[in-house]
Every structure is written in structure tokens, then in C-alpha cells.
A protein has these predicted regions:
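Gly/Ser/Thr-rich loops at beta-strand to alpha-helix junctions
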Residues: 78-88, 151-158, 180-184, 205-210
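Long, charge-patterned amphipathic alpha-helical coiled-coil/hairpin "stalk" segments used as oligomerization
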Residues: 124-188
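Buried hydrophobic positions in well-ordered alpha/beta secondary-structure cores of metabolic enzymes
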Residues: 82, 176-177, 215
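Electropositive, gly/pro-rich neighborhoods at or near active sites that engage anionic ligands
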Residues: 2-80, 88-90
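Glycine-rich, small/polar surface segments that engage phosphate groups of diverse ligands
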Residues: 78-137
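Generic secondary-structure signature for well-ordered alpha-helical cores
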Residues: 26-34, 48-55, 74-78, 95, ...
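C-terminal functional extensions of proteins
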Residues: 173, 183-225
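Short hydrophobic/aromatic-enriched beta-strand-loop microsegments
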Residues: 96-101, 169-178, 198-202
Length: 225
């Protein structure tokens, strides 16, 4: 009798994979962590998305983050993501979802040219993308004021957002910030924790778009979205 295929031996429906994975993470998380039940749920989903239990010890949740985030999502506040990968990872949402890296391009296609963002001179490839994200954050300032910022890739996006906050130009209801990398990511997230704004973040160089999406998806589930 031929041996069962690898797919037959190991593959499971997506829902069953998620159920088993979350149960395994729940069993592995410390029982006396100090998290509320809601915060524990979002930490659990972030660990699942990362496939790394060590992430649990790096997650930082502002005391007002869950309450403020749930209120904003239930009110259908705008969600602003830094890159498309974060937006693509989100559950269905009845409010608006904007992507900063696309914001300038959308503004230039506006029906009234006088409302469009001015064109910028060409820059080197890496710098051009970083600048475009920062300009997109600035262009989406009205959406960010009272909205939910979800930054999973670009430290530049978080730094630009913090500059807006410091200048008194916007006050997000919640910032989910997990930019990843060895340059500016840890510093940007540390700057975030120094400000009195509701946030969910991951200390150090770890992070990424899947973690940011997982954190917000946990809140969307809790909000009944």
C-alpha cells in the first residue's frame, strides 16, 4: 500500500490550522503576564503571525490602547496603513482604509488639480520610497486625526507621524507600530513609547507587516467587525 502523501499527512483546513495554532500559543503564554484578556488576545495573534513565542515578551501595549482602538473601530474611524502589504492583511472593515505609500499618487489624480499634492523631484530609489511614505502620512493627516494608524514596514512613516503629533497637527486614536529593521526601526518605536498616545508596538528590531495586521485584526474581531 503506497504511503500517504505529505499533503494528506500534514495539511489541514485553514480554520483548523488557526484554531490549533492559537491554542498552542495560549498554552505557551505566561499565565501571570499582567495583560487584560483583550490585550492577551492581540498578543496571542501577533505571536501566531510571527511564529515566534519570543515576540510576546517584546510587545508593549499602552494602558488605553485597547479601549481607544475598539472605540475608534466601532465608530468606523479611518485606518491608515503605511504600505499595501499591511492593508492586504486586514480583515474586512466597514470604514475607510488608506495606504500612505499610495496617497500622493491618489492626490495627483484628484478631479481638481489645485487640490493635488505638488510633484516632487526624482530621488534615488531607496530615498524616493521613504520620502513617498512620509509625504503620504502628511497627505493623510485629516484621516489620521482621530483615526487608526497601522505601520508595519516603514520606520519613516512612524517618524513622520510622530512629527505631526509633536506639531499638534493630528491626534490618532491608536497607533499600531511594528516597523522592522536595523536602521531607525527600534529608535522610532522607542520614540513612540515616550509619547502619551495609545499605541501597540514591538520593542527592538523585530516586527513587520504581518504583526501589524495581526494586532489590528485582533481588535477588529473584538470590535465585532
Amino acid at each position: 500500500m503506497p504511503a500517504a502523501s505529505l499533503t494528506a499527512r500534514y495539511a489541514l483546513p485553514a480554520e483548523e490550522i488557526e484554531r490549533r495554532s492559537l491554542a498552542m500559543v495560549e498554552a505557551a503564554l505566561p499565565s501571570c503576564s499582567g495583560w487584560t484578556s483583550e490585550a492577551r488576545e492581540l498578543v496571542k495573534r501577533m505571536v501566531y503571525a510571527a511564529g515566534d513565542l519570543a515576540i510576546a515578551g517584546l510587545v508593549r501595549v499602552h494602558p488605553e490602547a485597547v479601549t481607544a482602538g475598539l472605540a475608534a473601530l466601532r465608530a468606523r474611524a479611518p485606518i491608515v496603513c503605511d504600505v499595501r502589504m499591511v492593508a492586504a492583511g486586514l480583515r474586512a472593515y466597514e470604514g475607510r482604509v488608506k495606504v500612505a505609500v499610495d496617497a500622493q499618487r491618489e492626490a495627483q489624480r484628484a478631479p481638481r488639480p489645485e487640490l493635488a499634492e505638488p510633484a516632487v523631484a526624482p530621488l534615488p530609489a531607496g530615498q524616493e520610497r521613504a520620502t513617498r511614505v512620509a509625504q503620504g502620512i502628511a497627505a493623510l493627516q485629516p484621516e489620521l486625526d482621530g483615526g487608526v494608524a497601522v505601520i508595519g514596514n516603514a520606520p519613516t512613516a512612524l517618524l513622520a507621524l510622530l512629527d505631526l503629533i509633536d506639531a499638534g497637527r493630528c491626534a490618532p486614536a491608536l497607533i499600531v507600530a511594528t516597523p522592522v529593521g536595523f536602521v531607525a526601526a527600534a529608535e522610532a518605536k522607542q520614540e513612540l513609547t515616550r509619547r502619551d498616545v495609545p499605541y501597540i508596538t514591538v520593542e527592538g528590531t523585530r516586527g513587520g507587516s504581518p504583526l501589524a495586521a495581526a494586532a489590528l485584526n485582533a481588535l477588529l474581531i473584538l470590535a465585532g467587525q
